[in-house]
């Protein structure tokens, strides 16, 4: 039975109504079916604000200083239902923001703070996110007051930033612009485990080798934000924990210095809570009964608040003054020798062997009582690991450097998934350009577009070359963290120019023709590449009998090598591109699943994905010039032949090798075409076949061209945030 099964004597055994639970869904019957739902998320049907809602316009109405004043007041406005430690919510709001932003991973750009996803499952119920629900509920009166002018995503991150300011930190800045989602994300893979905090072994090739952590994951266990605070698989070993920290934080986009700064700065304020018994807590928010109203982990047997709060199970503060921004963390760590012990809840943690009474942090409710401070295994890693130790000692001896490093790392942590500065809004955006923001110089729009287009048309480059190059330049865009895309023309720079998926020799040949055109006309190369692709599409449409102009908006810029962190772009390299019928090697994941993942990252719907596949095949853009899926005798013409052939029952589909099929005439057995799984899924999957049949219809050849142009333009402009503004 499904998770909504309710058994009670005297109740009618007949089910009424719709399929409201997960257990009896279509995918439960056919778990291996292609899940197109990831392409149909976050549409207007789930958004209560409506299609016309414009967050950037609402933000213009926000009184930012009044909002920050209200947040500062909240920091010390302790509520009886969830009292503040030491009368301050600084630690609470810093942790809530940290844990929302800290789920980001660079591998696919998913996770992070950009969508307010902590409000929904699974993140709202992760073991590592215990009591972040209380943080969000404490913010509700402010969200209620400012309404649509501030998103939950922006509010949570701003609250964390204001918390640090209230503690005394000079922060680096803040940008608004995060838009809320309205249901759980269906596309993010958090791991294969079926239980919270399952041992790390299933996600590592070798748990003793941190680099063997499975992609795209960054956290070491299901339900954790980063590493296990008690040690690898809960077994204390600070050096082993350091190895996992280094890999995990690197996958979050952080270097060693940023890792030390974030760990120490995160633990300069607040405390761990483990003065209780986990068995006394109610279920997590998703599993709790309706009487809990979306709150989880409530103590149903004891007091459960203040000094009796349960969160991680570890217990204690890291510093003498946990509501102040100071250098107390490093001083506490290096001033004392530490021994392994256990919290009242039984969690492994470290405490000083000896410590002066005045160095102990006060009780959260009674300042006359003092308690032992504590360190996690991750904290001890900063002392034990040679690289982390050197950085930590430098920070301990230079508080200003530590404060600046943390402020910058905090800004990076909370803004990493927002994309370039063009998406930043509000009065506190820092003026400095940072390389991790993938800066792009302003482009020109005052050149003669028609003249540039004429130069490209006379260049001798084929429509296939033009379309493939523009596609390769634009397809790197990821809607998850808004990185990549055609703007910046980074396809000409390392590492993109050497990616196998970009066909380096063909790319170099095409760029050698387009670069002089850009230089001589005043257009950016980024614009010329896209304009060339548009021209190729127009030529292909004309060859099919349709005159159509592909929309073009000039103004892209060309980034330099100095503005490009080459190593950070490695994660954008495509391992496969079903749109060009290519994959680098065989993978456990099927080719059609990899196509779906790329389409989702690019922000495409299933119909858009379908029309792009059909058009790119017949134009002839396959990687390496392969003929797989080119179901036409009019290659180079933007016809609907791909769909016509795919749905023609005169054909038979025969597997002839790994991911390879032949399309044979049913009567003669003659081979007409070859195909891959990516091609055939548009006839085998019932939903995709329904789309294919629409485009195969005799009366929809023109619709196909128009829809292809619309989807193409969407891809080319995906990173043009200046247009959206």
Swiss-Prot record:
Picking any one GO molecular function of the record gives: metal ion binding
Cofactors: heme b
Alphabetically sorted, this entry's keywords are:
Heme, Hydrogen peroxide, Iron, Metal-binding, Oxidoreductase, Peroxidase
Catalytic reactions of this protein:
H2O2 + AH2 = A + 2 H2O; 2 H2O2 = O2 + 2 H2O
GO BP term, example = hydrogen peroxide catabolic process
Say where the cross-link Tryptophyl-tyrosyl-methioninium (Tyr-Met) (with W-98) occurs: 226-252
Briefly state the modifications made to the protein after translation.
Answer: Formation of the three residue Trp-Tyr-Met cross-link is important for the catalase, but not the peroxidase activity of the enzyme.
Q: Where is this site: Transition state stabilizer?
A: 95
* Catalytic-site annotation from UniProt: 99 (proton acceptor)
Give the Enzyme Commission number: 1.11.1.21
Q: Where does cross-link Tryptophyl-tyrosyl-methioninium (Trp-Tyr) (with M-252) occur?
A: 98-226
Entry-linked InterPro entries: Catalase_peroxidase, Haem_peroxidase, Haem_peroxidase_sf
Function text: Bifunctional enzyme with both catalase and broad-spectrum peroxidase activity.
Query: By its UniProt entry, which PANTHER family does this protein fall under?
Result: CATALASE-PEROXIDASE (PTHR30555:SF6), HYDROPEROXIDASE I, BIFUNCTIONAL CATALASE-PEROXIDASE (PTHR30555)
Which NCBIfam families does this chain map to? cat_per_HPI, PRK15061.1
Quaternary assembly: Homodimer or homotetramer.
Protein name per UniProt? Catalase-peroxidase
Which species is the source of this protein?
Answer: Paracoccus denitrificans (strain Pd 1222)
């Amino acid at each position: 039975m499904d998770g909504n099964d309710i058994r009670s004597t005297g109740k009618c055994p007949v089910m009424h109504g719709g399929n409201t639970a997960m257990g009896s869904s279509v995918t439960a019957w056919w778990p291996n079916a292609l899940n197109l739902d990831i392409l149909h998320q976050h549409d207007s049907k789930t958004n209560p604000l409506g299609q016309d809602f414009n967050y950037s316009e609402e933000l213009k109405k926000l009184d930012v200083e009044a909002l920050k004043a209200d947040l500062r007041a909240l920091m010390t406005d302790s509520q009886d239902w969830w009292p503040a430690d030491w009368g301050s919510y600084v630690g609470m709001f810093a942790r809530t923001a940290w844990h929302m932003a800290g789920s980001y991973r660079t591998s696919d750009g998913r996770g992070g703070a950009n969508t307010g996803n902590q409000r929904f499952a699974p993140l709202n119920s992760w073991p590592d996110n215990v009591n972040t629900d209380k943080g969000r509920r404490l913010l509700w009166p402010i969200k209620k007051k400012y309404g649509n002018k501030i998103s939950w995503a922006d509010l949570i991150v701003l609250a964390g930033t204001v918390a640090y300011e209230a503690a005394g930190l000079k922060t680096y800045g803040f940008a608004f612009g995060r838009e809320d989602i309205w249901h759980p994300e269906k596309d993010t893979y958090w791991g294969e485990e079926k239980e919270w905090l399952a041992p790390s072994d299933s996600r590592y090739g070798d748990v003793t080798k941190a680099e063997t952590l499975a992609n795209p994951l960054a956290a070491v266990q299901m339900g954790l934000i980063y590493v296990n605070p008690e040690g690898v698989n809960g077994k204390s070993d600070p050096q082993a924990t350091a190895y996992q920290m280094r890999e995990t934080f690197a996958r979050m986009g952080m270097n060693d210095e940023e890792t030390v700064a974030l760990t120490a700065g995160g633990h300069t304020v607040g405390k761990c809570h483990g003065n209780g018994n986990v068995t006394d807590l109610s279920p997590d928010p998703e599993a709790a009964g309706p009487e809990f109203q979306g709150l989880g982990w409530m103590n149903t047997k004891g007091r459960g608040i203040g000094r009796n709060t349960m969160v991680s199970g570890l217990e204690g503060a890291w510093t003498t003054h946990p509501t102040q921004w100071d250098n107390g963390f490093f001083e506490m760590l290096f001033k004392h020798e530490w021994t392994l012990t256990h919290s009242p809840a039984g969690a492994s943690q470290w405490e000083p062997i000896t410590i002066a009474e005045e160095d102990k942090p006060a009780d959260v409710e009674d300042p006359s009582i003092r308690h032992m401070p504590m360190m996690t295994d991750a904290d001890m890693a900063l002392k034990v690991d040679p690289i982390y130790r050197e950085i930590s000692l430098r920070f301990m001896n230079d508080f200003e450097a530590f404060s600046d490093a943390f402020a910058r790392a905090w800004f990076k942590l909370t803004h990493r998934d927002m994309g370039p500065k063009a998406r930043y809004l509000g009065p506190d955006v820092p003026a400095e350009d940072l390389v991790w923001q993938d800066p792009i110089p302003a482009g020109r729009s005052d050149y003669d577009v028609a003249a540039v287009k004429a130069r490209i048309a006379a260049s001798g480059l084929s429509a296939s070359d033009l379309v493939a190059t523009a596609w390769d330049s634009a397809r790197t865009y990821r809607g998850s963290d808004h990185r990549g895309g055609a703007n910046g023309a980074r396809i000409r720079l390392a590492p993109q120019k050497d990616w196998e998926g970009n066909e380096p020799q063909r790319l170099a040949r095409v760029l050698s023709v387009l670069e002089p055109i850009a230089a001589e006309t005043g257009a950016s190369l980024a614009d010329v590449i896209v304009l060339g692709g548009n021209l190729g599409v127009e030529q292909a449409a004309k060859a099919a009998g349709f005159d159509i102009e592909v929309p073009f908006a000039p103004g892209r810029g060309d980034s330099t090598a100095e503005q490009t962190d080459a190593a950070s772009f490695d994660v954008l390299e495509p391992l496969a591109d079903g749109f060009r019928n290519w994959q680098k090697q065989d993978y456990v994941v099927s080719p059609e699943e990899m196509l779906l993942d790329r389409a989702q990252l690019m922000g495409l719907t299933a119909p858009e994905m379908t029309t792009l596949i059909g058009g790119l095949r017949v134009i002839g853009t396959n990687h390496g010039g392969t003929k797989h899926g080119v179901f036409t005798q009019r290659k180079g013409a933007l016809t609907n032949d791909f769909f016509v052939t795919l749905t023609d029952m005169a054909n038979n589909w025969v597997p002839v090798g790994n991911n390879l099929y032949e399309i044979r005439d049913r009567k003669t057995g003659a081979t007409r075409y070859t195909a891959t799984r990516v091609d055939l899924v548009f006839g085998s999957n019932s939903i995709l076949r329904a789309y294919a049949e629409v485009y195969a219809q005799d009366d929809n050849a023109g619709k196909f061209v128009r829809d292809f142009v619309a989807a193409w333009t969407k891809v080319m402009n995906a990173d043009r945030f200046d247009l959206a503004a």
